[in-house]
Design a protein with these regions (language model features):
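Register position in tetratricopeptide repeats
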Residues: 29, 63-64, 97-98, 131-132, ...
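Structural marker of alpha-solenoid helical repeat scaffolds
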Residues: 9-12, 46, 80, 114, ...
């Protein structure tokens, strides 16, 4: 191809690195991930210390679920730019996926030092504290987040999950009730409610909640076992 000929002609030309990087982005938009990876890697062969190009490739690795390769690129970015928001955020995400919770917490803390009050980092801290069973700290952060973002349904659902984990089922139901008012077509809310009702032995209410979830789009086979159990 013409671009490979350009590389052979002037292998060290910086413009070639940019050319490959841009080509990789175009290929990625077209869904040609394998070709895009090759282009990003060619760009990085020419400019191995380019933060932008490392982030581009890391992001694509992450999309393709190549966590270990994405991790290496994000680490290299942080070595070059210790305060890079994107790299800190996504390396923390990778740590969470690997269940390396203390490492994730360290990155979220660093991110909050770089961007005080960053919403993603605050949510990350709440979730990582939950995973570390530091429930009080997790709940306090979720409480602050919900005060700051009262219409964010995902936060209400996340706090409800924490309340279920700590056996505060009535509080969880209150949060899910608030979430349902904000997002009446969110089927997952009704599945969560149904599970809590089952835990409480309120089978009839559980059945109604599961049926509502089916009505809102969850395939019936996915909830078949729950529907059957709640009919007993």
């Amino acid at each position: 191809a013409w671009f490979k000929k350009a590389l052979q002609k002037e292998p060290a030309n910086m413009r070639n690195a940019l050319l490959f990087s841009n080509l990789g982005t175009i290929q990625r938009r077209m869904g040609k991930n394998k070709e895009a990876l090759e282009s990003y890697s060619l760009a990085l062969n020419l400019t191995p210390y380019s933060v932008t190009m490392l982030l581009n490739r890391a992001s694509l690795y992450l999309d393709m679920d190549y966590l270990d390769k994405a991790y290496v690129d994000y680490c290299n970015v942080i070595d070059l730019d210790a305060k890079n928001q994107e790299a800190l955020q996504f390396r923390a995400y990778i740590y969470m996926r690997r269940r390396e919770y203390q490492e994730a917490k360290n990155d979220y803390q660093r991110l909050l030092e770089v961007v005080p009050g960053d919403k993603t980092a605050r949510i990350g801290m709440a979730m990582v504290n939950q995973k570390l069973q530091r429930y009080r700290e997790s709940l306090e952060e979720f409480n602050r987040l919900i005060v700051d973002y009262p219409k964010d349904v995902s936060l209400l659902k996340a706090r409800a999950e924490l309340e279920v984990e700590t056996n505060n089922l009535e509080l969880a139901l209150l949060d899910l009730e608030s979430a349902a008012k904000l997002a009446p077509n969110d089927a997952e809310i009704y599945v969560m409610c149904g599970d809590i009702y089952m835990e409480q032995g309120r089978n009839r209410e559980a059945y109604v909640a599961f049926e509502k979830a089916v009505e809102l789009g969850i395939p019936r086979p996915e909830l078949q076992d729950r529907l059957k159990a709640s009919k007993k």
